[in-house]
Regions:
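Short, Lys/Arg-enriched, disordered terminal segments
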Residues: 1-5, 96-97
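Amphipathic alpha-helical interaction surfaces in cytosolic regulatory modules
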Residues: 16-36, 46-65, 79-87
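Conserved short beta-strand edge segments in small beta-sheet-based binding/regulatory domains
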Residues: 36-39, 92-97
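Amphipathic, charged alpha-helical scaffolds that flank and support histidine-based chemistry
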Residues: 43, 67-85, 97
């Protein structure tokens, strides 16, 4: 069995964003750090994998929407780097904790 490490980041969006835009940000992180990323809109309980075909749908996140980003990595080091990168990339949209 392979060990995996996971964490969840939660925040409220300060401005409008599409799921595909959020997916691009997450994909940017994933190119540098191998991790699995799942996006959750807490208001609608909508789950999205940034690499799925769901991003072709015109789904949007609005200012004030609560989001959760679940990160899964194979090491604690990779997970820590992924958390830092996601927070850095999304700092203009939300404060994740």
């Amino acid at each position: 069995m392979v060990n995996s490490y996971s964490t969840s980041l939660k925040g409220t969006l300060s401005r409008w964003m599409s799921y595909s835009e959020l997916g691009v940000f997450c994909d940017t992180v994933n190119q540098k750090i191998p991790c699995k990323i799942v996006l959750i809109n807490s208001k609608t309980n909508f789950l999205a994998n940034p690499k799925s075909a769901l991003n072709t749908l015109n789904l949007n996140l609005n200012s004030g929407d609560d989001i959760e980003i679940v990160l899964i990595a194979s090491s604690e080091y990779e997970l820590d780097n992924c958390v830092k990168s996601i927070k850095d990339i999304l700092k203009g949209y939300t404060t994740l904790c």
